Structure formats: structure tokens, C-alpha cells
Amino acid sequence: MKKTAIALVVAGLAAASVAQAAPQENTFYAGVKAGQASFHDGLRALAREYKVGYHRNSFTYGVFGGYQILNQNNLGLAVELGYDDFGRAKGREKGKTVVKHTNHGTHLSLKGSYEVLEGLDVYGKAGVALVRSDYKLYNENSSTLKKLGEHHRARASGLFAVGAEYAVLPELAVRLEYQWLTRVGKYRPQDKPNTALNYNPWIGSINAGISYRFGQGAAPVVAAPEVVSKTFSLNSDVTFAFGKANLKPQAQATLDSIYGEMSQVKSAKVAVAGYTDRIGSDAFNVKLSQERADSVANYFVAKGVAADAISATGYGKANPVTGATCDQVKGRKALIACFAPDRRVEIAVNGTK
């Protein structure tokens, strides 16, 4: 009984800790991130065409905020709004920058997540970003790198990301994310405004971030199941013939009634204990009490109780309920009648409501 109660309490506490690790629904969060960006698809070809070197990697950073729409059964759904400096690519000639392409803008995306371990989510994001691309051209012959021209263009680009996020505390989470931005910018030379260069790179970046979740508070505590314990006592003279272990026909109605109550208990563990009176040898009484306990247990198994959820033990003449009441009684028939309360089968049922 005590072990069962302790186990249920521990299970309840474990469930509560899991709930505290996950973000709560209908709450907001905000964070910052930083990492490295890399330009791909078109940069190398453009550099070869104009016979310049290039730097594709740069520092990237951003801020983001989100609203947790759903978090149930390890599945989460949020909407995120952010602003990123997506990074920059540079064209280089003779050790000097001759062209620079920078990108920044806002983005909106849906974030779906799945909790793989307690407090650890993997996630994916898909959305759209409104990106402003700035192109700056420099005079490579000037030691001060005087700008010859500057041009910019805003364009919508697809944004996708995958990552992992860990809740250090219910209010604080860290994430590692790979993000890619598709077809960024569309440069048109100032002397040819109707002509666009075949240069629309996509930008991949790996970022580390940290976020604060608002309104988490104490997570809802999952209540431990209510412990249920029931005990039934059967008079052996009603259930069995004297000195026998076979169930009487009239015992069926009593056992069926007990089974009906037993079936209302969840995760039930059943212990059947058989007892005899003090008449006869110890060996005979232990054997008889065990057989009677087995008969009752087998009846319940036949009704549907799992065999591994029920036990049967015979205790012989142990634990008499008559005490010293029959010590002065004389005669076998009188003793048999007096000892009747000792001849019993007790059924203990423990589980949850």
C-alpha cells in the first residue's frame, strides 16, 4: 500500500517536471541570435566574370519574437516575427573592396516543433522575408575607396530553418539554428536600369540564440491519480465446504459482486489471502488455506483479471480474529462453530480511481 502510494506520487512529480520544461500555450517570447552567414549560388560566377576576388562569409545577427499557439503531446506550433542583418558579400581587387552587397530585413514564419527529450525540441520554420539588398561600388584606384555608386532593392524571399531548442528554465531557452534565405536581391546597373545581372544568391547561416518566455510562471501541476484501496472478507463456510477448497455454487454471486467493484479500479493489484481455524495440523491448515486462496484467485483470472496482477497466499491458522474467545469452548462441533470467523479469505485491491 505504501509502495503504491509512493510510486504514484513520484509519477505525478515527474509529469509535473515535464510540463514545466515545455513552453506554455498562448504565451509570448523574445530573443536575440548571432552567427555566421555564407552567400551561395552565383557569387563565384559573378566574381569570375568581373575578374575580382570575393568574400562570401560574414557576421550575421538578429532579433525575434514569437507567440506559442500550441504545445500538446510533444507537438508545438508558434508564429515568429524577426529582423535580421543577413550578412554581406564583398568583391575584392588588389586587397581592396570594390563592391559590397549587404542584406537586412524583416521576416514572418511558422515554427513547428517536436519534443524529443525532456525540455529539448527539434523544430522547423517556413516563412517569407522582405529583404533590402544594398549594393555599393567603390573606386578601386582611390586609396580612400570612394564610393562610385550605391543602389538598393527590396524583394520578398523564402525563408526556411531547422534547429534545436533547449529550455534551460521554463522562462529561458537556447537554440541552435541553420537558416537559409532564397533568391536575395536583383541588381540593376545604373547605366542599364532595365537590365538585371544574373545574380540572386541564397544565404545560408548558422546561428546561436537565446530567448525569454513571458508569462510562464508555475507550470500546471498534473495531479497524481487518486489511490484506491478496497478490502473484502469472505466467510469460508459460505464459500467452501468444511475442510474443502472447491468453491460452493452459491459463492459465485458473492465473487461476481466483488469482481464488479474490482473492475472499477484502474491498474488494480489484487492480493488474496487464505486463513483457517486452529483445528488440525499446521501443515494441513497451510495447505488448505493456500488451495482456497488459489481457488478464489483462479476464479477472478477466469473473469478477466490479469494473472500477473493477482497473487494468492495461504497463511494457515495465522492471524485469528477470534482471539481468546473460544479458549473455554468444549466439543468439536462447538469449536468448529466458534472458530467460523477465523475460516476466511481476504481480498485486498489496490489501484487508482
Curated annotation (Swiss-Prot):
- Name by which UniProt lists this protein: Outer membrane protein P5
What's the superkingdom here?
A: Bacteria
Signal sequence, renumbered to the chain: 1-21
This entry's Gene Ontology molecular function terms read: porin activity
Lineage at the top is: Bacteria, Pseudomonadati, Pseudomonadota, Gammaproteobacteria, Pasteurellales
Q: Where in the cell is it found?
A: Cell outer membrane
Question: Is Transmembrane given among the entry's keywords?
Answer: yes
PANTHER family hit by this protein: LIPOPROTEIN YIAD-RELATED (PTHR30329:SF21), STATOR ELEMENT OF FLAGELLAR MOTOR COMPLEX (PTHR30329)
Question: Where's the OmpA-like domain?
Answer: 227-353
| SUPFAM superfamilies attached to this UniProt entry | OMPA-like (SSF56925), OmpA-like (SSF103088)
Q: Name one GO biological process term.
A: monoatomic ion transmembrane transport
The record describes the protein's role as: With TolR probably plays a role in maintaining the position of the peptidoglycan cell wall in the periplasm. Acts as a porin with low permeability that allows slow penetration of small solutes; an internal gate slows down solute passage.
Q: Which proteins does it associate with, and in what oligomeric form?
A: Monomer and homodimer.
Q: Which family does it belong to?
A: Belongs to the outer membrane OOP (TC 1.B.6) superfamily. OmpA family.
